[in-house]
Structures are given as C-alpha cells and as structure tokens.
C-alpha cells in the first residue's frame, strides 16, 4: 500500500500548480523551478502507485500540466487506466491518415460517461428548425470562397463552460456578442449564468441542456440579457437574478436555418454573421486537436445533437471543405478553442439545429 502522506502531498502540489497549467514545461517560464519541483513530487507519487515506466511519467506530467488532483492510490490507477486508453486512441487514430488529428488534453483522464454528464446537454428536439425562415441572398450576391469572422473582429474570446452542460448558453452569447459588435463596433461579454438560471420557462434546463433558438426567444420576451460583469458565470444552476438595469443586449427576433440545409447555413455564415449550431459529440471528439473532423458514427437528427457551438466561418483544407466552429471548452482545447467540421454532409448534424439572432 502506498503511504497516504504521498497522496496528500500530491493534492497540495497539484493545487499549487493549477494556476500555471499552461506554463508547465516552458523554458521561458520564470517560475519553472517551482513547477519542476511540483512535477518531481507528483512523479514520485505516481511511480509509487504505478511503477517507474515511461507511460507513468507521461501521466504524471499530464496531471501537473492540467492541475489534476487524485486523492488515493485507487483513483491514480483509475485515471491512469483511462489516460492510457485515451493515449491509445490518439495513437491509433492518428496512424490512419485521416483529415484530422487527436491529441492529449485535459479530458484524457475522464471516462466518456463522466465527460458526457459534465460537458454535454441532453438531446432535445429542435422543432423550430423544421421549417426555417432564413432568406437566401439573390444569386447576384456572391458568397465569399472562404470566411472567418474573427478577421472582422466581431468574434468574442473563447470561454469555458466548466463542469456544466451549459454549452447552449455559450453558443447563444457567442452569437449575440458577435451581432452586437457587428452593429456597434464595440466588444461585449454577456451573461451565460442568466440563461442557466432564468431560461426554464422556454424549455431550457440550465446545466442539463437547452437550445440557442429557445434562448433567443427567452431573451426577446424577457427584455434583454445582462452583461457578464453584472451577472458572472458560476457553472451551476441557481436562482434567477436578472436586473433590467444591467441589460447589455436585446433581441428583436431570431432566424432559423431549415433542418439540414447547409446551403442556407453557408449563406448565413458567409453573408450575415456567426450562427449558433449544434451537433452530436461522440467519444473520440473530446480529444480533437487539429484538422477537419469527420465521422461515420455520429447522427444527424434533432434527437442526436447534444452540444451547441458557434459557426464563425468556413473554408477548404487539403481539399476537404469545412465549417470553422468556436467551442466552449477553453482556449487550450483543440485549435486554440476552435475546430473544423466537414461541410457538405450535414456532418454530425451541424446544420440540424442552427439559428442566429437579430439584436436591437
């Protein structure tokens, strides 16, 4: 049995290093000696539980980098097993020469069941998009060959939903923040927590999921959405604390893309502004690193989609057309918080539940 003292030390070490998760092994980091000592202590703990192997060392460095905390030898073994399975998935997938690559990230020691329960929403029927109301532009209005709304300066920074299935709120605020900045030329950060706490009457369920189309309707009839500063994110369901004097944006209406109509979605993303979309996340996607994601195993129906995000552009990479999408799992996930999804096949239902707001 491994002495409890070592695991207590590991918890303390990890707590101290959580604030420097992105600088763990950078040569330019001025506090590298502290990080190195923390890594050394955790490595000793992991080796005591797992033995001195290359994979155990890799696991210890992963834990330090992402500020992990393991409270017992049993948990170290459990997380190491999941981490090893993730590592094998990354290696086997990347050997296939697909259009995308996986990589180890902060989710590598979480089981699929844990990840699904804390990062994804429950499937909901996107009935609003059965018949869309987006008006396609005239044929004389040419779509740009590629589009990236970040280059126009209207896309807000990537946020992190944490351990709450509130992706729909971040998709909603991302679309609203872009629309507001496009209209005013000023940046804004809006309250996801208000949507978590206050949107239940419009068939949204806080940390258990919701839909941007329903969130836009809530904001429209509520009279607005507060700013992030006045109503900060907590990542748990709470009591509604909306205050009219703190409203940052109002919604006049929302526009829905017809279910599965990628031509409408491309028209909206190319010529209007970023669009809230949803798709089905399946197990390997959580380890996405780069490239154009594609899958033969995800669904495309309204009851398949389980994660809401924001389409901010499109393009072509190595001959594969893609959607450029902003996620809400932090800027250290994927390609600086973004990913690319294959276009033209309604991949994983990306055009199944899409809508965008019209702001006051």
Curated annotation (Swiss-Prot):
Signal keyword on record: yes
Q: Which domain of life is it from?
A: Eukaryota
The cross-references to SUPFAM superfamilies, in alphabetical order and at most eight, read: Cysteine proteinases (SSF54001)
Q: Which residues form the active site?
A: 167, 307, 327
Propeptide residues, per UniProt?
20-142
Q: What are its GO biological-process terms?
A: immune response; positive regulation of apoptotic signaling pathway; proteolysis involved in protein catabolic process
Sites carrying sugar chains: 125, 256
Q: Where in the cell is it found?
A: Vacuole
Q: Which GO terms describe its cellular component?
A: extracellular space; lysosome
Q: What is its EC number?
A: 3.4.22.-
Q: What is this protein called?
A: Cysteine proteinase 2
Annotated function: Involved in the degradation of the storage protein zein. May play a role in proteolysis during emergencies.
Q: Which UniProt keywords apply?
A: Disulfide bond, Glycoprotein, Hydrolase, Protease, Signal, Thiol protease, Vacuole, Zymogen
What organism does the UniProt record list as the source? Zea mays
What Pfam families does UniProt report for this protein, alphabetically?
Inhibitor_I29, Peptidase_C1
Name any one GO molecular function: cysteine-type endopeptidase activity
Cite the record's tissue specificity text. Answer: Expressed at the onset of germination.
Cysteine pairs forming cystine bridges in this chain are: 164-207, 198-240, 298-348
InterPro entries named in the record: Papain-like_cys_pep_sf, Pept_asp_AS, Pept_cys_AS, Pept_his_AS, Peptidase_C1A, Peptidase_C1A_C, Peptidase_C1A_papain-like, Prot_inhib_I29
């Amino acid at each position: 049995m491994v002495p409890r003292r070592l695991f207590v030390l590991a918890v303390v070490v990890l707590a101290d290093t959580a604030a420097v998760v992105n600088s763990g092994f950078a040569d330019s980091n001025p506090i590298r000696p502290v990080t190195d000592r923390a890594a050394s202590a955790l490595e000793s703990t992991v080796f005591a539980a797992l033995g001195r192997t290359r994979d155990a060392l890799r696991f210890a460095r992963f834990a330090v980098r992402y500020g992990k905390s393991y409270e017992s030898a049993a948990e170290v073994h459990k997380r190491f097993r999941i981490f090893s399975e993730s590592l094998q998935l990354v290696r086997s997938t990347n050997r296939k020469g697909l259009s995308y690559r996986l990589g180890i990230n902060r989710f590598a020691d979480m089981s699929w069941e844990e990840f699904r329960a804390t990062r994804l929403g429950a499937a909901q029927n996107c009935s609003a998009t059965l018949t869309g109301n987006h008006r396609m532009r005239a044929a004389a209005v040419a779509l740009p060959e590629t589009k990236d709304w970040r280059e126009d300066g209207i896309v807000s920074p990537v946020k992190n939903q944490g351990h709450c299935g509130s992706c729909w709120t971040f998709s909603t605020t991302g679309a609203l923040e872009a629309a507001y900045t496009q209209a005013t030329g000023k940046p804004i950060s809006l309250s996801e927590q208000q949507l978590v706490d206050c949107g239940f009457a419009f068939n949204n369920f806080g940390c258990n999921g919701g839909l941007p189309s329903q969130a836009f309707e809530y904001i429209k009839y509520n009279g607005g959405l507060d700013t992030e500063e006045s109503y900060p994110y907590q990542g748990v369901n709470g009591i509604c604390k909306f205050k009219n004097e703190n409203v940052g944006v109002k919604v006049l209406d929302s526009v829905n893309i017809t279910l599965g109509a990628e031509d409408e979605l491309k028209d909206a993303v190319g010529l209007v502004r970023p669009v809230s979309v949803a798709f089905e996340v399946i197990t390997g996607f959580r380890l996405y690193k780069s490239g154009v994601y594609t899958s033969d195993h995800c669904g495309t129906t309204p009851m398949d989609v389980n994660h809401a995000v924001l389409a901010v552009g499109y393009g072509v990479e190595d001959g594969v057309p893609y959607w450029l999408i902003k996620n809400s799992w932090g800027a250290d996930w994927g390609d600086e918080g973004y990913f690319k999804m294959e276009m033209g096949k309604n991949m994983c239902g990306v055009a199944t539940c899409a809508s965008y707001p019209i702001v006051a």
